[in-house]
Regions:
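Ser/Thr/Pro/Gly-rich low-complexity disordered regions
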Residues: 3, 10-29, 34-133
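Intrinsic disorder/low-complexity segments
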Residues: 1-2, 119, 265, 315
Length: 381
């Protein structure tokens, strides 16, 4: 499936194909009246990542079955790559698991007897990718910001329903790493992980345990100190596994595809001239086309959106902000305000933590201050 032909997904409508309803006429009896011959297609919400929940909704009165005055009369089932997902209940919600990674999911609505021939199915989703960074670290699909203190303590700040939960310490000694980042689930166990690069260039994987802690570490690379920036965009080439982008001193940007088991596939060049940008962040799908994107700030303070094409490359660039050079830290860790769109956080010179709310179309839907005293952290991710 090409990037251009993949259905729009996330917090938007999944187009549906309509199967015509067929009602047999009983002998010596009038044909029962169909309430709706062409019901509206169902709508699927949710992100196509392991750990996310897909929800199907529809107008129940468009599926009234047969007979005068018949009420809502439907049942639901889900398919995985066209086969009935018998391991999932026939409910409107579908929690995506590791068994769904790389597969496509569809929801089916069937009118119960006597209209058993009436069935409407949504189009299949894009292939499900590994759990991504915005899903958090405690298996709740919550916004959970990691902050490293100068003493090396790693703190987690969960935020649910626009309210911060109490911070908790999830690690010590993390000041040995000049660079830390979260690629999402990098080893294929369904839990989100963290990568740390030490001063000698060793790259270490800390596997998440799904409860806000870590198992490991284990070394997954050497020589990574040749890079001036490391970020994880998520699944940048749409193969179902999470990846890393690395920029060298010459400004060459490399894509290191993850193999889904804590290792790597062969790298490729993803861009040139990226040393003109002093900050690179990875907000996920920022423009609503199902492909993950990259935001980058230049020395003049312009914030640029580089749209991913879903195949390890780009689909154009646009400027989405000015004046961002007044912010000491910029990053993205998911959906801060719970509206279904990915956002950007930033710390200003006074230590205020600001949220810049994405509109799901490559732009903004306002901003707000969501915290104070954040200037003392050496890293936020």
């Amino acid at each position: 499936m090409s990037a251009s032909s993949r259905p729009a997904f996330g917090v938007r409508r999944a187009l549906a194909g309509i199967a015509a309803a067929v009602v047999a006429m009983a002998t010596f009896a009038p044909a029962p009246a169909m309430a709706t011959m062409d019901p509206e297609p169902p709508v699927i919400t949710g992100a196509p990542y392991v750990g996310s929940t897909l929800t199907v909704s529809w107008d129940p009165y468009a599926y009234k079955g047969c007979g005068a005055g018949a009420g809502p009369d439907t049942r639901i089932y889900w398919t995985r790559d066209g086969e009935v997902a018998t391991d999932h209940p026939t409910w409107p919600n579908y929690v995506l698991g590791e068994e769904d990674r790389g597969k496509t999911i569809a929801a089916h609505l069937v009118a119960n007897y006597p209209c058993e021939n009436m069935e409407v199915a949504s189009e299949e989703t894009a292939p499900i990718s590994a759990s991504h960074r915005p899903s958090g670290f405690t298996s709740r699909s919550a916004f959970e910001l990691l902050a490293r203190r100068s003493d090396g303590a790693l703190m987690m700040y969960p935020r649910i329903n626009n309210t911060w939960e109490p911070a908790r310490t999830v690690g010590v000694g993390w000041n040995i790493f000049p660079t830390v980042l979260s690629p999402g689930d990098f080893d294929g166990d369904g839990n989100n992980d963290v990568l740390g690069r030490d001063s000698a260039g060793g790259l270490y994987l800390y596997s998440g345990d799904g409860a806000g802690g870590w198992t490991g570490p284990r070394k997954v690379g050497t020589g990574w100190n040749i890079f001036t920036a490391l970020v994880s965009p998520g699944d940048f080439n749409s193969d179902g596994t999470n990846d890393v982008l690395a920029r060298d001193a010459n400004g060459v940007l490399y894509l290191y595809p993850g193999d889904g088991h804590g290792g790597w596939l062969p790298r490729s060049v993803a861009g040139q001239g990226w040393n003109a940008l002093n900050t690179i962040i990875t907000p996920g799908d920022f423009d609503g086309d199902t492909n993950v994107d990259v935001l980058a700030r230049d020395s003049a303070g312009s914030l640029k959106l580089y749209r991913g094409n879903g195949a390890g490359g780009w689909n154009g660039m646009s400027v989405v902000g000015q004046g961002w050079n007044g912010l000491s830290k910029i990053g993205s860790a998911g959906d801060i305000n719970g509206d279904g769109n990915f956002d950007v956080f930033a710390v200003d010179g006074s230590g205020q933590l600001k949220a810049y709310y994405g509109n799901g179309k490559g732009g903004w839907n306002g901003s707000g201050v969501v915290g104070w005293g954040w200037g003392g952290f050496t890293d936020l991710f």
